[in-house]
Structure formats: C-alpha cells, structure tokens
Design a protein with these regions (language model features):
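Intrinsically disordered, low-complexity, mixed-charge
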Residues: 1-82
C-alpha cells in the first residue's frame, strides 16, 4: 500500500474540488482526506494500491471538478499517513 501527500493550488476551493476528489477516490478504492488550507490550496493525504493511486493522482492533476483548475501540484511520498 502506497501513501502520498499532495498539495494542489489553482481554482481548487469553492468549486467542488474536494467533493469530486472524494468521488474519484471512492470509485478507485483510495482512502484519505482532503483539507482546504488558508493559502487557498488543498492538501490531500491518500493511500491505496499502487495502480489505483497512480490513476487517482492523474485525475487530481487534471482537476476532478468541472469548474476547478490546477495551477500547481506537488507530491510527497508519505509512509506516516495512517
């Protein structure tokens, strides 16, 4: 099981980004959480099987929300997420 932390900036708050991210995660069997940060970014902590997590990461990069737009994306491997 792989565990990652992602920070996403752009139009990611107030557009359903976290809700749609949760829907994608549920479809792929990914567990975790997404939080709005004061700086306007969203931080996502996620874990799941490698192949499903890779698909999830690609969908987050493309913005799962129709009105969202990802300006930057950082990924950190994070084995401490539980």
């Amino acid at each position: 099981m792989r565990k990652v932390r992602m920070r996403v900036t752009g139009r990611v708050q107030g557009v359903g980004f976290r809700f749609m991210t949760k829907m994608v995660a549920d479809q792929l069997g990914i567990w975790g959480c997404a939080t709005n940060e004061d700086d306007g970014s969203v931080v996502i902590e996620a874990m799941g099987p490698d192949e499903a997590l890779e698909t999830f990461i690609e969908k987050v990069k493309a913005s799962p929300a129709p009105y969202g737009r990802v300006a930057s994306f950082t990924l950190t491997e994070n084995p401490t997420i539980e």
